[in-house]
Regions:
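Serine-dependent protease modules
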Residues: 1-190, 198-199, 225-229, 233-239, ...
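Conserved PDZ fold ligand-binding element
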Residues: 11-12, 203-225
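Extended hydrophobic-aromatic, low-complexity segments
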Residues: 204-206, 253, 264
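Disulfide-stabilized, aromatic/cysteine-rich ligand-recognition loop
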Residues: 256
Length: 264
């Protein structure tokens, strides 16, 4: 499935939907069929941007002022099992889900019990006002030993929009890269404990070590790991940031040159 995002034919879908495709064809509900060009894709969010030669297309309205809340009505629109356009109804079960699926980079999923079956991936998740709130991406289903029901996930439209416009502008999503593994512990005094440093990463080059506690990033303190990741991700490569750490009781400011996140 896919979602028309602009009147001139930019479409969002999931990367896994079009991966390894020799040709991509888009069939609209009105029966019109278009050959689509792949503009770019993003591994971390599993999103891809397509373009068809069309004008005056209808798009789903969005409302940036309305926050997605647990208990909201959710409608998943897509093409499950190639049956044709279908709508399933549920509620928003949770927001801010992370570490879902096979990529640690995918964060902040919307969880819903609206059915997302094979073929729904890349389709629209809308609210009861008909506003686009997410892009349906994956579900946790049956395994050999158990059956999971109602565990379906969508990428929030705010993240999807950001990826869309970056791919339209640059052909890909350019993210900042720091190169550490981290956690927050009870005795880290609100800081973020470094549990691993990737060799030859910006953090390693700046002298950051395992056991250091990050207190501030560019003078911003009390950051969660997710907030720190987002700040780094949004930082342009070759930009210097000041990381304030605690090491063996000493507070140290370390300049770090952010690099571009490697594609792998």
């Amino acid at each position: 499935s896919g979602v028309i995002m602009t009147k001139d034919g930019y479409i969002l879908t999931n990367k896994h939907v079009i991966q390894n495709a020799d040709q991509i064809v888009v069939a609209l509900q009105n029966g019109n069929i278009y050959e689509a060009n792949l503009i770019g894709s993003d591994n971390l969010t599993d999103l891809a941007v397509l373009k068809i030669k069309a004008t005056n297309l209808s798009t789903i309205p969005q409302n940036k002022e309305r926050q997605v809340r647990v208990g909201d009505i959710a409608l998943a629109i897509g093409n499950p099992y190639n049956l044709g356009q279908s709508v399933s109804q549920g509620i928003i079960s949770a927001v801010g889900r992370s570490a879902v699926g096979d990529s640690l980079g995918r964060q902040n999923f919307i969880q819903t019990d609206a059915s997302i079956n094979r073929g729904n991936s890349g389709g629209a998740l809308i609210n009861s006002a008909g506003e686009l709130v997410g892009i349906s991406t994956l579900s946790i289903g049956k395994t050999a030993n158990e059956i999971a029901e109602g565990l379906n996930f969508a990428i929030p439209i705010s993240i999807a929009n950001d990826v869309l416009y970056k791919i339209i502008r640059d052909g890909r999503v350019i993210r900042g890269y720091f190169g550490v593994q981290s956690e927050i512990t009870a005795n880290s005094n609100g800081g973020i404990v470094i549990t691993g440093v990737t060799a030859n990463s910006p953090a390693a080059k700046a002298g950051i070590q395992v056991g250091d506690v990050i207190l501030r990033l560019n003078k911003q303190d009390n950051l969660s790991i997710r907030e720190m990741m987002q700040i780094i991700s949004d930082t342009k490569p070759n930009t210097e940031v000041i990381v304030t750490i605690s090491r063996l009781g000493n507070v140290i400011d370390l300049p770090v040159i952010i690099e571009e996140l490697p594609s792998n």
